[in-house]
Design a protein with these regions (language model features):
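Conserved active-site tyrosine of GNAT-family acetyltransferases
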Residues: 35-40, 104, 139
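Conserved beta-strand-loop-alpha-helix junction that forms the acyl-donor binding cleft
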Residues: 29-31
């Protein structure tokens, strides 16, 4: 198994080393400034690096990584209209769901599905997670999850 390491230089010249995940979504956004504020200030993602000239940013939160780039027509496969990302649900596993939920509430950001505990069957186990859903400024559906562990499925 090989590991890809990306080295980049931020705007003040400090070197960062990033282990790249096997899948890193790149979201097209309508307004880079608005989206960057939303992801970094409200959702508490870390800005790993940016290319302001391309209106691009690489972000992380715990072990999750995403890229955002203002729509420029380069990656479009069809016409974009709100809500972007129809039919997709990004599940983002985080360490402290209450901290993030509190940030959204403090910023009076609308919650699509309120925080709740759910258990999903996976063969003979139930996997638990505390979760809530929101739409980002462009309508991408984001499901934030904190794992609660697993337990045996009870026999009927």
């Amino acid at each position: 198994m090989s590991v890809i390491i990306l080295q980049s230089i931020n705007l003040v010249g400090e070197a960062f080393l990033h282990k790249l995940n096997a899948l890193i979504p790149e979201l097209s956004v309508s307004d880079m400034e608005k989206s960057l504020y939303f992801y970094s200030e409200i959702l508490l993602f870390k800005i790993e690096y940016q290319r302001p000239e391309d209106k691009f940013a690489f972000l992380s939160l715990n072990d999750c990584q995403i890229m955002i780039e203002e729509v420029n027509g380069h990656w479009n496969t069809g016409e974009l209209s709100y809500p972007y990302g129809r039919g997709i649900n990004f599940q983002i596993v985080i360490n402290d769901i209450d901290l993030l939920y509190g940030s959204l509430k403090k910023n009076e950001y609308p919650i699509k599905f309120d925080i709740q505990e759910n258990w999903y069957r996976a063969e003979t186990k139930l996997k638990g997670q505390k979760e809530f859903l929101i739409l980002d400024p462009d309508g991408y559906l984001l499901r934030f999850v904190q794992n609660l562990g697993e337990k045996d499925v009870e026999a009927d």
